[in-house]
Amino acid sequence: MYIDAATLPSSAVLLDVDGTILDLAPTPLEVVVPPELTIALERLSKRTGGALAFVSGRPLAELDLFFQPLKLPSIAGHGAELRLNDGTVARANTFLDPQLKADLASIADDKPGVVVEDKNYSVAIHYRQAPHLGHAVRDEVSAVCARFPSTAIEILPGKSVVEVKQPSFNKGTAVRELMQHAPFKGRRPIFIGDDVTDEAAFAVLPEFNGVGFSVGREVQGIAGMFEQPSDVRRWIAEMVLTKKDAK
């Protein structure tokens, strides 16, 4: 619909996960990966010569768990982890202060429906099940982080979530690094993302003559927009459709 399948052999397809190819769920561990999506992703990887990668805020281990048996090249943890096509993994060597993580976790103690997710390199406070507490959660996250003035901290607001991480890495810096390695090098990246946390990746696309597509929200400079994750899944299926499948 948006990209001619004939361009796939010269493209690199980069996909955010939650809210982009998977529907959002009440909690991070409740997301559902349709079996047909895993099959389509495997085909898409072959169509692109292996130049298909996840670009996610989730830890690498979770991506592997949800999409098994696939182990695609991946940018995980908002750029803290980078797995290349040959399986090698580079990881950031900076971590959040343990006391900061503990204080952030305590935000949920008196807030039913608020879920704290420790992602190793970041902490996410989800309020999807308690949207009325969104303002309180955001205010408390800011207050907690203000108690650690000597610590480099980045606060990322998202869809019913606030994430706290080190500012030394993000999806954009990781995409830039990924594009230096085979089979991504020299290809035109196609990135699809849905949230504020994806904007760093959108920002580096012009460096590689890339194109970006958002899901459910307008983003400056993008080439187009999908309404919802099911539309992205449908697009992926169409990109890998063979003549035999069409019969």
Where are the predicted features?
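Non-catalytic pre-domain segments flanking phosphatase-related domains
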Residues: M1-V17, I21-A25, L29, E36, ...
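Mg2+-dependent phosphoryl-transfer enzymes with acidic/Ser/Thr/Gly-rich catalytic loops
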Residues: L8, P34, G172-K247
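The start of beta-strands in P-loop NTPase/AAA+ ATPase cores
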Residues: S11-V13, D18, A51, L72, ...
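Residue-level signal for inorganic ion chemistry
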Residues: G19, S74, I125, V175, ...
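Active-site phosphate-binding/coordination module
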Residues: V32-K119
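Substrate-recognition/cap helix-loop segment adjacent to the acidic, metal-dependent catalytic center
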Residues: R58-G77, L133-I153
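Substrate-recognition "cap/lid" segment bordering the active-site pocket of phosphatases
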Residues: G77-D103, L156-G186
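Charged, glycine-interspersed solvent-exposed loop segments at helix/strand-loop junctions
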Residues: V114-H132, A152-K165
